[in-house]
């Protein structure tokens, strides 16, 4: 008789972070205030369920600003945009709300500040990721992308007297540390951020997987294929020696994954809503799991304020003009 899973161990923390919460709320409140449609440049966050849910509410997701009609309301995604995109959007006269995660904006501000002081940059990140494109697009030149240690050996900055390193916020903490060490070894005078650019939520979710993986036979990560931080969670569990799969929904779970498994670890990327975690939990319980246990973990209480003009009382629909700090229950 094949053994079925007996216990589900839930990573803590998991799922939505403050930047994702804020980005989704910006789109929802813009629709509430201005009416549908609201245009969003790129997926607001990299999650299929979230994007489809917002589409149903009246959001239209576009990649090219030419696809947005004159006078429309436009939201920039949580990943941030380049200066060129921002300037083009302003020139086209859109009503713009910026849902860029404040921790990504922090990197943009640092790049702009140091560039004025004559710095060049080495950026650690994944080529083609919208966050990387947005950060590199803060300057016309002088940012060199490296994806691995081998790239560090090949990079050729114009000068090394003033050189700084920045990173994509959703990288593997361990990979970023290894690449940063290689940068430091080649350019000993390189300036590093006062605080690492990898965000608190990425760090916390990876730390939770490090605790989770050794205690289970299988790790399931809830997240979409385009989600960088979700992919890093799956890779991390595998690197720790635990078989791991990533699913966009409960329907993607395969029965054969659970053969011979007694304890399943479950986590979710920072853009994956808790409703998907519950659906995956229910599916695993249907396969035989009889208990669900939450791990001890860090409680995240960070909440980022909304842009001016979108602080709306949910009960009355009226704009809130004075409310500090912005408070409310965590999403999911």
Language-model features: locations:
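The feature marks the mature, well-folded catalytic cores of soluble enzymes
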Residues: 1-268, 274-332
